[in-house]
UniProtKB/Swiss-Prot annotation:
Part of a stable entry-fusion complex (EFC) which is at least composed of proteins OPG143, OPG147, OPG155, OPG086, OPG094, OPG107, OPG104, and OPG099. Formation of the viral membrane is necessary for the assembly of the complex. Interacts with OPG094. Interacts with OPG153. InterPro entries: Pox_virus_G9/A16 (IPR004251). It is a single-pass type II membrane protein. Induction: Expressed in the late phase of the viral replicative cycle. The gene is OPG143. Keywords: ATP-binding, Disulfide bond, DNA-binding, Fusion of virus membrane with host membrane, Helicase, Hydrolase, Late protein, Lipoprotein, Membrane, Myristate, Nucleotide-binding, Phosphoprotein, Signal-anchor, Transcription, Transcription regulation, Transcription termination, Transmembrane, Transmembrane helix, Viral envelope protein, Viral penetration into host cytoplasm, Virion, Virus entry into host cell. This is Virion membrane protein OPG143. Pfam families: Pox_G9-A16 (PF03003). One of its GO terms (molecular function) is ATP binding. The chain crosses the membrane at residues 342-362. Most cysteines are linked by disulfide bonds. They are created by the viral disulfide bond formation pathway, a poxvirus-specific redox pathway that operates on the cytoplasmic side of the MV membranes. Residues 2-341 are virion surface. The lineage of its organism: Viruses, Varidnaviria, Bamfordvirae, Nucleocytoviricota, Pokkesviricetes.
Amino acid sequence: MGAAVTLNRINIASGIADIRDKYMELGFNYPKYNRTVKFAEESYMYYYETSPGEIKPKFCLIDGMSIDHCSSFIVPEFAKQYVLIHGEPCSSFKFRPGTLIYYQNEVTPEYIKDLKHATDYIASGQRCHFIKKDYLLGDSDSVAKCCSKTNTKHCPKIFNNNYKTEHCDDFMTGFCRNDPGNPNCLEWLRVKRKPAMSTYSDICSKHMDARYCSEFIRIIRPDYFTFGDTALYVFCNDHKGNRNCWCANYPKSNSGDKYLGPRVCWLHECTDESRDRKWLYYNQDVQRTRCKYVGCTINVNSLALKNSQAELTSNCTRTTSTVGDIHPGEPVVKDKIKLPTWLGAAITLVVISVIFYFISIYSRPKIKTNDINVRRR
């Protein structure tokens, strides 16, 4: 039977390129669980910028810590030119508060979150982040120029990072409602930020026949298909007479009872005319990939009737290959990391031991004894 996973050693090694960086080597009795966690302990006094207009000390400010810890790493004369903003999420060791754990290799935010008892030793926080006062955008015109990429020459990085952060979401929501086909709006959508997908879901629920809605459906499937299904449902519910909607919202009719299989495989609006997947719900899109289309033609040059009977034979199954759609993909489901547990193994060991004990008792040979006759007078 296996033994429990135990921590045998912890070694702290200093970095070579940067003395602030350190490596915590965790050694277990099973080598496959060994990990090296890189972290930083800030010790510099900043009088320079880590990037244009920004200073980001290697310090994780966890709950309960004063923000004065962040300003303690900047020289007073230099600090007057900067202001502290909401930094990126980070993790820190509770027994060494302020340390900044690097996310790399197997060590990710999801890995730390899913670790059993991780919150007993690791705390979440915000990294110290300063921006030069001259880089703060104090008016809507400056935000518009940066987020719409009209003029990004003097834009801070948080407003000029290809929409990777939330800083342009408010502006882009209003901007893209007025111009949803704008290339910058489609770039914002391709990042798959929730505000962008929600905005286009609302837009396409009124204008699903627009070209940009085809791109919208392509981007959100398969992981965020509900945004597209909602838009299609609302649009087709408001436009029941639109033939493009007849696959998703087919008019009530008894003709469907004459065919076998889902209508997405045989209905004219689902196959021949409506090749754009935006007119299908996601489950219909998946279903259509399982439909096999066979095209057959019969050319008659002359026709001779005998006894009023005519036979037409189509040789479609010999030379014609079936054609189907490409599968749109499956949504990604992230499973939680399962750490090894020995509770089940321990219970099994106890049960087996008890069984063997009773077997050994009852399998021993009987001890011979003399019969004793007892008679009562």
